[in-house]
Amino acid sequence: MQGLFKKGAQLFLGLTLGVFYPLIFQALAQQTESLIYEIGAQFQLEGHIISTEVHGNGNVNDTFLLFCEDEDSLNRYTLQRINHEVFKDPEGLMNNFSRVTRHLQAKIEEERSSKECLRVVSARDGRAFHRDSDGNFWRVTRFVDGGRSYDVPENDRQAYEAAKAYGEFQAKLSDMPGEPLLDTIPDFHNTRMRFENFRTAVERDEAGRSSEVGDLVEFALEREFLADKIKAEDFPVRVVHNDTKLNNVLLHKSTGEGMCVVDLDTVMPGCALHDFGDLVRTAACASVEDEVDLDKVRFLPETYGSIVEGYMESAGDMLDSREVGHLALAPLVITYELGLRFLTDYLEGDVYFKVKRPGHNLDRVRAQFKLLVSMEESLEEMEDIVLRFSATKSLA
């Protein structure tokens, strides 16, 4: 009798949740859409908002598309909530953002180029952002038409175009006037600091997970030497992107050319090698960064060659011999660094990166460390590729 009652209760609960869960999610979606309409109305948009949708799969900010109707035209905008838990000074960040985009736009106009850059849409009070009643910071940029992003390149030309676009981005910003940009995340690519944070996370074991990942901890400890291979203070300080994943470059849908670099929150003073290395990490790999089938994770030397070619074509004249001399090692360092960050976040209870499933950060760690091993096996070939493409450049 008791078992029958238990089964009946489970059935009732299942039916109840089956009925009400869709209603709950529908109510939450309607509440979110209402908020997005309200926030969007705080900006100087052309036309009135007729629809919105969630956009992208970023790990930090929340992003939405706004569709605005203005007489006979349809205008699209990108609305983002700046994660002020990650970016502690959103106003300073938006000052960086505005300065960088104005400078890039001026360069594009001066060169009469067909390239694009993000353009900030001011709030109704004239600022580059809106702060809502809950203390959240929001910004709007014009949607860039005609471009497409890729998590993994479909061919080596896409990797070449992305590398060329990032090199042009660095080169265009090399003469930006004014005070240095704000460090939106201090020590963002301080690999030594990332290692020490990882070691502390292992020792504290706040989430009780370290016993599950002993092999990964050992792997990271064995490669501590990588933490000191590229120190920012040993290289020229440049205005760099700091998050140069392949999908942060829009490639033209028709021509395939790199047309716009996006996701500018971490643009700040830094080392060009970190930008180069992070692009290689995402573009010269046969899989996405959270691939669960590790047999698919491998480094692609041929694609690396295309990246070196594109980057040297646009940024080679800017780089000095020390930077070029570390182009082979940079991808290993940045891959190790990101693996450390994912592992640290897992040990701390998944508090920084967005996770979409149990063990998501762990999947990311395993994929990055597998990629690192593949890079280590290809290091000599990478060095030969750099020598081949740098031979024609006059280095400072």
Q: What is the meaning of each model-derived region?
A:
Residues 11:
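Cationic, low-complexity basic patches in intrinsically disordered or flexible, solvent-exposed regions
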Residues 87-91, 147-160, 175-241, 246, ...:
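ATP-dependent phospho-/nucleotidyl transfer catalytic cores
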Residues 337-396:
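ATP/Mg2+ or Mg2+-diphosphate-binding catalytic cores
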Residues 25-48:
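Juxta-kinase regulatory segment immediately upstream of eukaryotic protein kinase catalytic domains
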Residues 62, 67-69, 74-77, 82-193:
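Conserved ATP-binding subdomain of kinase catalytic cores across diverse folds
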Residues 273-317, 333-352:
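Active-site activation/catalytic loop segments of kinase-like enzymes and analogous catalytic loops
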Residues 54-57:
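Protein kinase glycine-rich loop
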Residues 59-68, 74-79, 120, 224-274, ...:
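Active-site acidic catalytic loop and adjacent metal/ATP-binding pocket
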